[in-house]
């Protein structure tokens, strides 16, 4: 991959955008970091300055009142600054942990607000995975921008403080009686000396820039290795994985996979780079810092020896020069971190900036008391992004509110695609879908979605209370939740739970949570759809974990309680078909049969009759 050349302007622009993005997450963080950086950077200089005043007085007039004044000032000022620094340091660490967790809200909001068609793309999921990988394995991304800000302030304020305390070092004159050491007064010598120090530090900055470039190259090439390691290290935490691992001895497979993944081993790419180009450049950069400090020490000692200043000033300049060298080193290293982080911030914002291209209408869906809605598909066709095959082709049909509609067909026949189009998770490339005669794209998206309750086959429950799972909110009507659970067949299980609706699902947060079976989870998901009380209820194979008889019982019960709602059933198993008003049979993206259960059975050679006869033993006495 060809690397993009970036300027200092590019790096700073990305850093500033990251700060603007993180600041609303917790507005207290950056002010606290700024105050703490000020205290951290200037405390050494204040200590050095006050100590130097005491030494100057001790080596000079030794006046007790002056010594007491400086001693008391030193204790009070340094003590107060140290106390404040400790306070703000604790605040900074607490806020840093807080902002680390809260910044995930940015990604959650983006995930649920972007077009579903984009969210469903593999490249979008890979992009999000790459962002998480960068943060979890190398610490780069949004949070590193906060660290860079903190370190940059420490370095910059340290340099400013150091320059302020060492300016006298360069302005003080060596006496003319100092012989050859009077060269230290020469403007030419001072310019050459400054140029050498600047050159050494620019060289160190270039070294850190090269280290950042190498790290970015390693990071790009380590994507697969990162994912392998992440998969293996999180494997034990996945529910049910160790059962299969024990039975089928999968440990050896995982061990071999980990052994062959040399990304982070001593002999791998990172290990070789640490011992080679990165290690060498890091050592040279550290060495340059030591050389800078040594030159300043030598210059200071020669001036003091020549009589340019007293022992107190010598202490001040040596201490300030040491702190200044450390601050310069911090600033240069931070610039390297800034360079390294830019590419990862670009990845982050590429995800956060994904545009929503789905047309957003302005019409509201009628809140009809009679729930009199009708839906029509007109010559609808869809290809999924990146596919050349039609998932749905030239589909036309109508259905009225209050009807029972079954959609059947084999895997890949287009059943779920039909539902995704109905719910406007995708827009068709051809044709149109109408609600009460109006193209659904003209309705407000949230309003339109509000008329559907859906239970998908791959539904998810969250590790929260049972009541919150059903209601989708922490505030809910307990009686309605209980009724929905009872209607879904979960009533007996609910009665056995000591905490009732407050029972925590799963044990992610503690041992007081409960594990629910696949069948129980599906009943909770169905109860969630019932609680929403939308005019359309769609069941997309949600009963796959139930046996055929239990499924038939659930569907029969669901048919009773759905009332005047439109119910759409999708299932491999056909227990729902007997009481449906109409059945659509899909095959290879098209509707090949349409009619009632009895009418379709009369077509003995038809697809529906074949599917029904293969399963009839489960539904007939």
What are these regions (language model features)?
Residues 499-500, 556, 563, 573-621:
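C-terminal portion of ABC ATPase nucleotide-binding domains
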Residues 1-43, 65-69, 88-92, 124-160, ...:
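Membrane-integrated ABC transporters
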Residues 1-16, 97-143, 224-272, 342-355, ...:
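Extended non-transmembrane interhelical loops and adjacent amphipathic helices
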Residues 434, 491-524, 533, 618-621:
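ABC-fold ATPase nucleotide-binding domain signature/coupling loops
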Residues 250, 296, 315-354:
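Cytosolic ends of transmembrane helices, especially the final helix of ABC transmembrane type-1 domains
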Residues 31-84, 159-212, 302, 307-311, ...:
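Transmembrane helix-loop-helix hairpins at lipid-water interfaces of multipass membrane proteins
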Residues 247, 251, 352-403, 483, ...:
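Primarily ABC-family ATPase nucleotide-binding module
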Residues 423:
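Helix-to-loop junction immediately C-terminal to a conserved catalytic motif
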């Amino acid at each position: 991959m060809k690397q993009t050349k970036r300027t200092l302007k590019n790096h700073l622009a990305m850093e500033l955008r990251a700060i603007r993005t993180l600041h609303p997450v917790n507005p207290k963080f950056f002010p606290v970091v700024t105050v703490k950086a000020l205290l951290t950077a200037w405390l050494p200089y204040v200590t050095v300055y006050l100590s130097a005043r005491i030494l100057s007085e001790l080596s000079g007039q030794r006046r007790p009142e002056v010594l007491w004044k400086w001693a008391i000032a030193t204790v009070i000022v340094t003590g107060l600054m140290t106390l404040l620094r400790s306070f703000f340091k604790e605040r900074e660490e607490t806020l840093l942990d807080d902002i680390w967790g809260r910044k995930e809200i940015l990604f959650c909001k983006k995930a649920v607000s972007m077009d579903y068609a984009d969210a469903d793309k593999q490249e979008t999921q890979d992009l999000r995975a790459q962002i998480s990988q960068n943060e979890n394995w190398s610490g780069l991304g949004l949070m590193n921008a906060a660290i860079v800000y903190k370190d940059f302030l420490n370095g910059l304020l340290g340099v400013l403080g150091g320059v302020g305390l060492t300016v006298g070092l360069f302005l003080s004159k060596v006496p003319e009686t100092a012989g050859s050491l009077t060269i230290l007064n020469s403007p030419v010598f001072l310019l050459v000396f400054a140029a050498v120090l600047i050159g050494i530090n620019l060289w160190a900055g270039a070294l850190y820039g090269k280290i950042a470039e190498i790290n970015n190259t390693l990071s790009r090439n380590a994507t697969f290795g990162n994912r392998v390691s992440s998969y293996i290290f999180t494997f034990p935490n996945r529910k049910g994985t160790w059962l299969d691992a024990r039975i089928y001895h999968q440990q050896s497979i995982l061990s071999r996979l980990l052994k062959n993944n040399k990304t982070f081993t001593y002999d791998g790419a990172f290990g070789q780079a640490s011992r080679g180009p990165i290690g060498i450049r890091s050592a040279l950069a550290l060495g340059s810092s030591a050389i800078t400090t040594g030159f300043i020490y030598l210059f200071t000692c020669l001036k003091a020896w020549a009589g340019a200043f007293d022992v107190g000033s010598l202490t001040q300049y040596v201490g300030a020069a040491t702190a200044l060298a450390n601050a310069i080193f911090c600033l240069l290293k931070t610039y390297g971190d800034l360079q390294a982080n830019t590419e990862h911030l670009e990845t982050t914002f590429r995800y956060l900036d994904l545009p929503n291209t789905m047309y957003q209408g302005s019409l509201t869906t009628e809140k009809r008391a009679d729930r009199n809605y009708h839906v029509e598909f007109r010559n609808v066709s869809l290809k999924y992004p990146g596919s050349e095959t039609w998932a749905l082709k030239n589909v036309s049909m109508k259905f009225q509110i209050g009807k029972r509609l079954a959609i059947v067909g084999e895997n890949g026949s287009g059943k779920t695609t039909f539902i995704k189009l109905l719910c406007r998770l995708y827009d068709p490339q051809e044709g149109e879908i109408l609600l009460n005669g109006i193209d659904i794209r003209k309705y407000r998206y949230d309003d339109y979605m509000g008329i559907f309750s859906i239970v998908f086959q791959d539904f998810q429950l969250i590790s929260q209370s049972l009541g919150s799972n059903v209601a989708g909110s922490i505030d809910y009507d307990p009686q309605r939740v209980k009724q929905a659970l009872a209607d879904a067949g979960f009533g007996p299980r609910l009665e056995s739970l000591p905490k009732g609706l407050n029972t925590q699902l799963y044990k992610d947060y503690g041992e007081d949570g409960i594990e629910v079976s696949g069948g129980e989870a599906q009943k909770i998901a169905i109860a969630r759809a019932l609680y929403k009380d939308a005019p359309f209820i769609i069941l997309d194979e949600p009963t796959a974990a139930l046996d055929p008889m239990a499924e038939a019982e659930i569907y029969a019960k669901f048919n009773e309680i759905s009332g005047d709602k439109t119910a759409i059933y999708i299932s491999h198993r056909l227990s729902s078909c007997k009481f449906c008003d109409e059945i659509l049979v899909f095959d290879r993206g098209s509707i090949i049969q349409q009619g009632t259960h009895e009418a379709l059975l009369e077509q003995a050679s038809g697809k529906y009759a074949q599917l029904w006869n293969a399963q009839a033993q489960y539904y007939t006495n």
